[in-house]
A protein has these predicted regions:
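Charge-rich, low-complexity N-terminal segments
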Residues: 1-48
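Ser/Thr- (and often Asn-) enriched beta-sheet segments in non-cytosolic proteins
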Residues: 2-7, 20-22, 89-91, 96-98, ...
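A general marker of short, structured functional hotspots
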Residues: 3-4, 41-44, 62, 116, ...
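Generic alpha-helical secondary structure signal
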Residues: 11-12, 49-52, 124, 134
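Short, well-structured hydrophobic secondary-structure segments
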Residues: 29-75
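Amphipathic protein-protein interaction modules
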Residues: 68-128
């Protein structure tokens, strides 16, 4: 799965960051018989992982506040850390990251969802790299997870 951050030109708000998810030919071929599997995966990763990172870490300064905690978990100096964001609570340990909706909690519309720590870390770093770039239609960062 490839997650790409880029900009589009919104007539009301100007250049606006947006994510795009693509799958490799290998993933498409492998999942060809599993009807809807990739679309479901794309929807879940967009709803939780990408939205969680984009909404809860809107600028580099906030990322830099949280990054030392993430690094401590990765190095094994901390068992777990939690980030209470505007969209989600991110409960992070070395194996996985759980997302619980900040306002609605665990509910039918937003069940508890998780991804691998490595996936979270890669998207988090890609988002930081993207935010450091010039705001331009040509600016983009692709992350493979």
């Amino acid at each position: 799965m490839i997650i790409k951050f880029g900009y589009y030109d919104d007539e009301d708000f100007g250049l606006t960051a947006f994510p795009e998810i693509k799958f490799s030919e290998k993933e498409i071929t492998k999942n060809n018989k599993k009807n809807g599997h990739l679309e479901k995966k794309k929807a879940e990763y967009t709803k939780y992982l990408i939205t969680g990172i984009m909404e809860d870490f809107p600028d580099v300064e906030i990322i830099d506040i949280f990054l030392p905690q993430l690094e401590k978990v990765e190095a094994g100096k901390m068992q777990e850390t939690v980030w209470d964001g505007q969209a989600f609570q991110h409960k992070i340990n070395k194996e996985k990251v759980e997302f619980e909706h900040t306002i609605f909690g665990i509910c039918e519309e937003y069940p508890l969802w998780e991804c691998k720590f490595e996936e979270y870390r890669k998207v988090f770093e890609g988002w930081k790299k993207f935010l450091k770039m010039e705001v331009d239609l040509k600016s983009e960062v692709a992350v493979e997870i």
